């Protein structure tokens, strides 16, 4: 066994016990191992003793002798241990007794200093372990005395502070979590500086720390108020909202903490062992420590808002892709309340944005004006461009190009089918240099369609003349309709012939 430093030192009763065990009359004396003479002890060192002292007294049940004093930070001594015999003697000794259980490094184990644990057990808390170690699973209460541990319980030590900010009360009401590992936590906790400040204040008020036991994969947590009485209380996690300080249950008198994930004590005390055997503890799906999203009370959702085009125009939604829609007849009361609220804020909320122009002005005008920033008002994002009107002085747009003398607007309108290329929503504006290869059209070019108002008026005049002729001849109603439809077909055929001829197409 290699020499290894151990913190702390043994008291004088231990020195006498080691001397008695290693004496020739002791129970660990062996014929094949020569014992060394007693070593003189220095002030900061242990004496050298045999590994047989760490061996089992009974081969069927290995026993590890417990250190009576707690190992503290002030213990700076070291102990050295080595075999008195050679390698062959050590092999014979290990052959007689079963193997000693593998011991973890002392840096991975920490002992509690207060209160003093029983002589047969040592309590370990997960928060005292280094950060690279996973939280230890600890026994509670009677489980420690029985020597059994439960794999579903994790110990979380916390400190106590007053809920109302007072410093004179002796009854702790709030708990602040300390040293919770980030990879094991499922909720957010305050910063380390806040924890240090809270722990300093809490240690002055109460010397007995509170221990919270969280069931892995569960929403309930158990709290030990006093380490001597081991009282257990059921705790429930409550999500954090803006009004969390006022969020209290009626059957719960006092909150346990004001952190994210509020702990609220139940009115009854639970027996952990009995409930675990009976399976009374609830389980949580996916291992979350908070309730599911469907059960969390949240703020009311806004189901009717101005960004709905149907609602803004004063219509009901019909064949829309909206989810949880309330803009229908089934939610008439909610819709009426939303309309009343919108009109209370803005009396002109439901008026059309594109209104009629002034007297003598043929083109309509935007009532409020657009508010474009990066589109240049040459896309359907702009309400003025979508309505095929130019921006006016009431618009609040930046970098506007939708005005009469704009070269970009003229280039865009000179393109064939410009509404399909530059007017569609989401289309990209192309600068004039991109259209250098496109054919230029003269200003006196023919319109894209030959159906003008003059053509429509001429067609209607032909239909009226045919109707008057049928009336003069006293034709029946069916015959008069037939004559009018034949005249309409003749007019339409003439219009199409003219259209094809203008484009150089032949009509079969």
UniProtKB/Swiss-Prot annotation:
Modified residues annotated as N6-acetyllysine in this record: 40
Cross-referenced PROSITE patterns: CRC (PS51634)
SMART domains: CXC
GO cellular component: cytoplasm; male germ cell nucleus; nucleus
Gene Ontology molecular function, alphabetical: metal ion binding
Transmembrane stretches, start-end: none
Domain of life of the organism encoding this protein: Eukaryota
Domain CRC positions: 292-405
Main location as per UniProt: cytoplasm
Keywords recorded for this protein, A-Z: Acetylation, Cytoplasm, Developmental protein, Differentiation, Meiosis, Nucleus, Spermatogenesis
Record flagged with keyword Cytoplasm: yes
Subcellular location: Cytoplasm; Nucleus
Protein family: Belongs to the lin-54 family.
Name listed for the protein in its UniProt record: Tesmin
Species for this entry: Homo sapiens (Human)
Taxonomic classification: Eukaryota, Metazoa, Chordata, Craniata, Vertebrata
């Amino acid at each position: 066994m290699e020499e290894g430093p151990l913190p702390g030192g043994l008291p004088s009763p231990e020195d006498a016990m080691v001397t008695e065990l290693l004496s020739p009359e002791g129970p660990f004396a062996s014929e094949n191992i020569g014992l060394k003479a007693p070593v003189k002890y220095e002030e900061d060192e242990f004496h050298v003793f045999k590994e047989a002292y760490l061996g089992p007294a009974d081969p069927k049940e290995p026993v590890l002798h417990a250190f009576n004093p707690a190992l503290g930070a002030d213990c700076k001594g070291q102990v050295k241990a080595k075999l008195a015999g050679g390698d062959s003697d050590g092999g014979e000794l290990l052959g007689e007794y079963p193997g000693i259980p593998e011991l973890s490094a002392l840096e991975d184990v920490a002992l509690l200093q207060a209160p003093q644990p029983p002589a047969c057990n040592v309590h370990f808390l997960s928060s005292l372990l280094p950060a690279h170690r996973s939280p230890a699973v600890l026994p509670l209460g009677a489980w420690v005395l029985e020597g059994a541990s439960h794999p579903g319980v994790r110990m979380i030590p916390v400190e106590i502070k007053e809920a109302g900010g007072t410093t004179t009360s002796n009854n702790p009401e709030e708990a602040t979590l300390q040293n919770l590992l980030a990879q094991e936590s499922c909720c957010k906790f305050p910063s380390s500086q806040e924890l240090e400040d809270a722990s300093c204040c809490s240690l002055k008020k109460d010397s007995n720390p509170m221990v919270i036991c969280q069931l892995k994969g569960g929403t309930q947590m158990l709290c030990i108020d006093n380490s001597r009485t081991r009282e257990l209380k059921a705790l429930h996690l409550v999500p954090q909202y803006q009004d969390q300080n006022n969020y209290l249950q009626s059957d719960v008198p006092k909150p346990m903490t004001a952190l994210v994930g509020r702990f609220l004590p139940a009115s009854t005390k639970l027996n952990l062992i009995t409930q675990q055997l009976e399976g009374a503890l609830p389980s949580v799906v996916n291992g979350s420590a908070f309730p599911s999203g469907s059960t969390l009370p949240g703020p009311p959702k806004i189901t009717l808002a101005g960004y709905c085009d149907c609602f803004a125009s004063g219509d009901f939604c019909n064949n829309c892709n909206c989810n949880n829609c309330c803009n229908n007849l089934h939610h008439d009361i909610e819709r009426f309340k939303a309309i009343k609220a919108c009109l209370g804020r803005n009396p002109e909320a439901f008026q059309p944005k594109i209104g009629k122009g002034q007297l003598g002005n043929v083109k309509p005008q935007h009532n409020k004006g657009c508010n474009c920033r990066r589109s240049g008002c040459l896309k359907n994002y702009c309400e003025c461009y979508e309505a095929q009107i130019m921006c006016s002085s009431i618009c609040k747009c930046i970098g506007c190009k939708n005005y009469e003398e704009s070269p970009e607007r003229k280039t865009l309108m000179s393109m064939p089918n410009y509404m399909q290329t530059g007017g569609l929503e989401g289309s990209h504006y192309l600068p004039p240099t991109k259209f250098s290869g496109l054919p230029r059209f003269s200003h006196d070019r023919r319109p894209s369609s030959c159906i003008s108002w003059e053509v429509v008026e001429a067609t209607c005049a032909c239909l009226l003349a045919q109707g008057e002729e049928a009336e003069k001849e006293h034709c029946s109603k069916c015959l008069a309709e037939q004559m009018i439809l034949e005249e309409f077909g003749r007019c339409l055929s003439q219009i199409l012939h003219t259209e094809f001829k203008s484009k150089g197409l032949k009509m079969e």
